[in-house]
Swiss-Prot record:
Annotated MADS-box domain residues: 1-61
Domain (K-box) ranges: 87-177
Entries under InterPro entries matching the protein: MADS-box/MEF2_TF (IPR050142), MEF2-like_N (IPR033896), TF_Kbox (IPR002487), TF_MADSbox (IPR002100), TF_MADSbox_sf (IPR036879)
Gene Ontology terms: biological process: positive regulation of transcription by RNA polymerase II
Protein name, as recorded: MADS-box transcription factor 56
Sample GO molecular function, one term: RNA polymerase II transcription regulatory region sequence-specific DNA binding
Major localization listed first in the record, in broad terms: nucleus
One Gene Ontology cellular component: nucleus
Function of the molecule: Probable transcription factor.
UniProt entry tagged with the keyword DNA-binding: yes
Species whose genome carries this gene: Oryza sativa subsp. indica (Rice)
Length: 233
């Protein structure tokens, strides 16, 4: 008669649960001891009861030694596993990039009109649409650049016209200043007898009057003439 398999589930009765824990715990500790002795294995066992009481077993001189060994092993294993995962990820990324580059190169060749022998009508239509879209974008960019250049040239033209107007204003100011200076020089120059006017008795007197020498004399009245006569004598 085959014995039925007992379903494992939590024991609801606290007393029964505590009795079962004590029996199973002792059996587990015994099995751990037998495993370490029979197989020369380093075994460590840590058990906490439902009430929080600690039970432990270690085949090594101390449980901490086994725990430290476990930490060192898991650390090295995790690091090695991480490195292997990183290497595999790099390989996968490299392979994916190589496939993308190959596809891009193939697409470039087809756009340039190369390797079209194996293309279907749908593929050729798709290439045609891509080319038309590319040409449209190129024309838009070209128009944008031309508009920018025209705007810069117009701005430069406005600047040059403004500078030219400023220079004309300065030139007009210089001409006006030169005319004023010439007029002032003409009006302040000494008068000379015109060569075309004939010399008559009246004009001769006027000419003599222009040639009269004047002397400044300081002294008593009546002494000026005597002084002049003595000088001429």
């Amino acid at each position: 008669m085959v014995r039925g398999r007992t379903e494992l589930k939590r024991i609801e009765n606290p007393t029964s649960r505590q009795v079962t824990f004590s029996k199973r715990r002792n059996g587990l500790l015994k099995k751990a001891f037998e495993l370490s002795v029979l197989c020369d294995a380093e075994v460590a066992l840590i058990v906490f009861s439902p009430r929080g009481r600690l039970y432990e077993f270690a085949s090594a001189p101390s449980l901490q030694k086994t725990i430290d060994r476990y930490k060192a092993y898991t650390k090295d294993h995790v690091n090695n596993k991480t490195i292997q995962q990183d290497i595999q990820q790099v390989k996968d990324d490299t392979l994916g990039l190589a496939k993308k580059l190959e596809a891009l190169d193939e697409s470039r060749r087809k756009i340039l009109g190369e390797n079209l022998e194996g293309c279907s009508i749908e593929e050729l239509r798709g290439l045609e649409m891509k080319l038309e879209k590319s040409l449209h974008n190129i024309r838009l960019k070209k128009t944008e650049l031309l508009e920018r250049q025209i705007a810069k040239l117009k701005e430069k033209e406005r600047t040059l016209l403004k500078d030219n107007e400023n220079l004309r204003g300065k030139h007009r100011n210089l001409e006006a200043a030169a005319l004023v200076a010439n007029h002032m020089t003409t009006t302040t120059a000494p008068a000379a007898w015109p060569r075309d006017v004939p010399m008559t008795s009246s004009t001769a007197g006027a000419a003599d009057a222009m040639d009269v020498e004047t002397d400044l004399y300081i002294g008593l009245p009546g002494t000026e003439r005597s002084s002049n006569r003595s000088e001429t004598g």
